[in-house]
């Protein structure tokens, strides 16, 4: 039957991409439907019980700055929080949290159920309704037809998913869930370019059978306790737990090598390429044969379970090898395995067939987000989901769509990498992928994106009010530091020397003093003038987050300004549009190879064209000349 209500946006899939997509579309004002095969698994953390990390934490902060759910859900579910790279510069500092799986799922579901304009329906989707070159809806496994102006597909690892344990395999989307075989077949019929990728997960351990006395404890950060959301605070966190560290050894490695002949990866059973930066333990032993041991992090799965996730031993080896492998690890000699590790192969679609909005080029109104685009990780999925859901809603409501630039957000880097370069292995975000990372820090994600989110309709009043107060307070304090001056008379040697290492000889602004490497904002604000008054101003000193933002903006002002100059130089050509119907055969002097690559990728801008492998700067110059001629010719015709 035809479902009696029509929708602006239909989101297929209830994982990290799907939930953010549905929430974003509904926040913008689109009538949104979320279709999931199981309401109980909305927001399920299918693999590791953690959020964030280098590059990934930056994406979570950006999702939060745009009104998304992941950061706040993590603050409500996080059982350990740490700042990675804390001793390094602010560009590469990143937040990471262990999360209670049940609490995280509960936090996400609560937001979905309480979001106005969002309907949830439990049914697996078997087919898409396509009329001409446009999607018009989705069909579920019982033949129920839902019509919508746009569809966001977030199928994760479910498309023709195949689970491997040793040389045994069976169909599945993840352990305990069926695959989306019919939908996978339907997408093949639409002739969208696709491939196979692989990911994996480790066996799970009963924590009661672990000997913690021989392990190294890894507590979270306590002073201060990190938070993920710009609206979050440490009081939201549940009870905190430590993680523990053990190591593989020579016996572990011998056990793994002895089982490689029955590994689906090394016997040719698995065709898909696995994630380079999250390799299986058998891959580590094979690729790093000279390494005597590898760290294994024992991560609690939650407050009300004894289940432990051994991060670092993802494997698809036969269970008897997994058994010996786990019991060879110090502290796990008597461990009980609750679930076997496995690998899963799944279909993905070449993201070069997407526009930068994440809409497919071939089928209007159809958006892809998450692992279906060849990425790996909850954070990458959530970021794509938010963007795809927002753009699906904007298109359905006849509004202009939006994509962040590479200099605006890690989300912009992620999408640009996907649609211009494609993937040959599961894509993971790192800070090293961003050429403007000094400007794309975790701490300023809201200052970069919340105003944009407000204009799009993604940011509610509460978030906007909190952001506005922060923005104004930081700006006022930075200005105060620039306009407040000290000199040898009102800032005497007995005050200056402990702070600066020597007395001052001339007049300086407080901003000048803060730019010195050894001077912190907190120390400067504790210093006193000759009359005994503090240098501190009102409203910022007692707020660690505001104080950090002020210090970074002042200390790195010169570097950030230089980076912004560089951005402006590149921006003109970066954003220059290429007509969708351009005839590359008419561009004189292009090589055959470049012509073919441009025809295949159909870049939307000069910037995208320049990042296609094999497209040279000389070819870009020829393309610019051709576009100039087209523009001149069209103006001449109009006259």
Swiss-Prot record:
One of the GO biological process terms: tRNA methylation
Cofactors that this protein relies on: FAD
Aminoacyl-tRNA synthetase in keyword set: no
Keywords, comma-separated and alphabetical: Cytoplasm, FAD, Flavoprotein, NAD, tRNA processing
UniProt-annotated location(s): Cytoplasm
SUPFAM superfamilies membership: FAD/NAD(P)-binding domain
Protein name, entry field: tRNA uridine 5-carboxymethylaminomethyl modification enzyme MnmG
Species in which this protein is naturally found: Bordetella petrii (strain ATCC BAA-461 / DSM 12804 / CCUG 43448)
């Amino acid at each position: 039957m035809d479902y009696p209500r029509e929708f602006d946006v239909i989101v297929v899939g209830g994982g990290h991409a799907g939930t953010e997509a549905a929430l974003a579309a509904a926040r913008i004002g689109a009538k949104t439907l979320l279709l999931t095969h199981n309401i109980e698994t909305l927001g399920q953390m299918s693999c590791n019980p953690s959020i964030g990390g280098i590059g990934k934490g930056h994406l979570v902060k950006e999702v939060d700055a745009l009104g998304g759910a992941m950061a706040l859900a993590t603050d409500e579910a996080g059982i350990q929080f740490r700042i990675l790279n804390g001793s390094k510069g602010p560009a590469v500092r990143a937040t990471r949290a262990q999360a209670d799986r049940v609490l995280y799922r509960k936090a996400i579901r609560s937001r979905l159920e309480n979001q106005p304009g969002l309907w949830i329906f439990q049914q697996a989707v078997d087919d898409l309704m396509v009329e001409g070159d446009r999607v018009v809806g989705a069909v579920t496994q019982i033949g129920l037809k839902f019509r919508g102006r746009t569809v966001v597909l977030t199928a994760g690892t479910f498309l023709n998913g195949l689970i491997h344990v040793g040389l045994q395999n069976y169909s599945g989307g993840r352990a305990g869930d069926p695959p989306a075989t019919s939908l996978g077949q339907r997408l093949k019929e639409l002739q969208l370019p696709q491939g196979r990728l692989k990911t994996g997960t480790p066996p799970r351990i009963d924590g009661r059978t672990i000997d913690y006395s021989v392990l190294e404890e890894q507590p979270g950060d306590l002073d201060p306790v990190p938070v993920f959301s710009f609206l979050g605070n440490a009081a939201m966190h549940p009870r905190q737990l430590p993680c523990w560290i053990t190591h593989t050894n020579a016996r572990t490695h011998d056990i793994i090598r002895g089982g490689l002949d029955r590994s689906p990866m090394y016997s040719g059973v698995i065709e898909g390429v696995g994630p380079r930066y999250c390799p299986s333990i058998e891959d580590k032993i094979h690729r790093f044969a000279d390494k005597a041991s590898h760290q294994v992090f024992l991560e609690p799965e939650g407050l009300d379970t004894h289940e432990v996730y051994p991060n670092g031993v993802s494997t698809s080896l036969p269970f008897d090898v997994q058994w010996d492998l786990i019991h060879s690890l110090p502290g796990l000699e008597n461990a009980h395995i609750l679930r076997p590790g496995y690998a899963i192969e799944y279909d993905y679609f070449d993201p070069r067939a997407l526009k930068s909005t994440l809409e497919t080029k071939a089928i209007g109104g159809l958006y892809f987000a998450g692992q279906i685009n060849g990425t790996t990780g909850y954070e990458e999925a959530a970021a794509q989901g938010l963007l795809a859901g927002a753009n699906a809603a904007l298109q359905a409501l006849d509004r202009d769509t939006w994509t962040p630039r590479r200099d605006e957000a890690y989300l912009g880097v992620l999408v640009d990498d996907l649609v211009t370069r494609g993937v040959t292995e599961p894509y993971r975000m790192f800070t090293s992928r961003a050429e403007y990372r000094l400007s794309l820090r975790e701490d300023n994600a809201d200052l970069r994106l919340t105003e944009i989110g407000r204009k799009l309709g993604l940011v509610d009043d509460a978030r906007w009010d909190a952001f506005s107060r922060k923005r104004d307070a930081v700006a006022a304090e930075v200005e105060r530091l620039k306009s407040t001056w000290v000199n040898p008379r009102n800032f005497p040697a007995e005050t200056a020397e402990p702070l600066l290492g020597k007395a001052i000889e001339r007049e300086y602004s407080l901003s000048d003093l803060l730019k010195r490497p050894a001077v912190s904002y907190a120390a400067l604000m504790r210093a006193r003038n000759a009359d005994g008054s503090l240098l501190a101003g009102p409203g910022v000193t007692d707020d660690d987050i505001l104080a950090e933002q002020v210090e970074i903006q002042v200390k790195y002002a010169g570097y950030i300004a230089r980076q912004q100059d560089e951005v402006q130089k590149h921006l003109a050509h970066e954003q220059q549009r290429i007509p969708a119907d351009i005839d590359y055969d008419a561009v004189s002097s292009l090589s055959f190879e470049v012509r073919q690559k441009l025809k295949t990728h159909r870049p939307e801008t000069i910037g995208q064209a320049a990042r296609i492998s094999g497209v040279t700067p000389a070819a870009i110059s020829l393309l610019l000349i051709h576009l100039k001629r087209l523009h001149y010719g069209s103006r001449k015709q109009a006259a």
